[in-house]
Amino acid sequence: MRVSDFNFDLPDELIARYPKTDRVSCRLLQLNGENGEIFHRTFSDVLDLIDEGDLLIFNNTRVIPARMFGRKASGGKIEVLVERMLDEHRFLAHIRSSKSPKEGAELFLGEDKLGENNGIKAVMKARHSSLFEVELSDKSTALLDVLQTIGHMPLPPYIDRPDEEADKECYQTVYSKVPGAVAAPTAGLHFDENLLEKLKAKGVNFEFVTLHVGAGTFQPVRVENIEDHVMHAEYVEVSQEVCNAIIATKKAGKRVIAVGTTSVRSIESAALSAEEFGNPDLIEPYFSDTSIFIYPGKKFRVVDCLITNFHLPESTLIMLVSAFAGYKNTMNAYKQAVQEKYRFFSYGDAMFINKNSNVRELE
């Protein structure tokens, strides 16, 4: 398939630049992946769509204030976006500047918040392809503390506005726990504490994986044929406890419901890894990077239902949804969502999808 097969027209006014004040009040498009049937709901209706004994898989990564502004020692302005924390003082980052800093170059970060000549000193240690390895000069302060002081929330480029104080809470799931993401697992933004308590009271089970979402999630696909695309790598943790819960859920005849594409990629990576090591009917713990790319023709080994936001045209995420619900069903649902003026992308509305069991498998 071609990347252009996943294009659709989206009016600019349908891009959500601010979230709903009430997380559960967003709209929910329910898509039956088996027959393409569509229902228009409110997100709080997921309480009626999820049954006792079903298992919800959440991604508990926490977004770090990963964007910093500063300058090089030579005076040139820079914008630094942390991609991955390596340890308490070193990180990999994207750096925007008129001229890329050279190895050994001194950087002064956070002067927009700390004042001129008061920036936090760092050094560009090495370059790794498009990423720069940066080390804080002062070892008495941890990177996370530095980011909390001078960092900005890394809102996606399509939101097209500076971050605001409210984004520190709004661009974070209520169950986020493990710092490391530079983008939110946005399907989870629609859950509030009250809805989670109601789901628990109904007998719905919860488990948490960790996938630290990287900035690569916003990168366009730059090839014509989707099979030629190489995914960026992101770090994943799927514990033995999660694996046990998934196996028990399947044995009980209940459903595994992934909250977000990052949860899908996490548990499907763990299942694929188990299959590659000779255990095709199992899922095993997974603590490693994943670059899994799921597109039409790829099979799902674990996930039965998916809760997800509306994604960018020609993105790997709409390709994943198309693999799950069927290409025609997905593109028709997106067409209806535009017609019905759903809100799109990170701060937008959501979908609840059950898997199309008849999608073609190429593997």
Swiss-Prot record:
NCBIfam families: PRK00147.1, queA. It holds the Pfam family Queuosine_synth. The gene is queA. Gene3D superfamilies: QueA-like. Monomer. GO terms for cellular component: cytoplasm. InterPro entries: QueA, QueA_dom1, QueA_dom2, QueA_sf. This is S-adenosylmethionine:tRNA ribosyltransferase-isomerase. It comes from Haemophilus influenzae (strain PittEE). Its EC number is 2.4.99.17. Pathway: tRNA modification; tRNA-queuosine biosynthesis. GO terms for biological process: queuosine biosynthetic process; tRNA wobble guanine modification. One of its GO terms (molecular function) is S-adenosylmethionine:tRNA ribosyltransferase-isomerase activity. It comes from the Bacteria. It is an enzyme of class 2 (transferase). Belongs to the QueA family. It catalyses: 7-aminomethyl-7-carbaguanosine(34) in tRNA + S-adenosyl-L-methionine = epoxyqueuosine(34) in tRNA + adenine + L-methionine + 2 H(+). Transfers and isomerizes the ribose moiety from AdoMet to the 7-aminomethyl group of 7-deazaguanine (preQ1-tRNA) to give epoxyqueuosine (oQ-tRNA). It is found in: Cytoplasm. Its main location: cytoplasm. Keywords: Cytoplasm, Queuosine biosynthesis, S-adenosyl-L-methionine, Transferase.
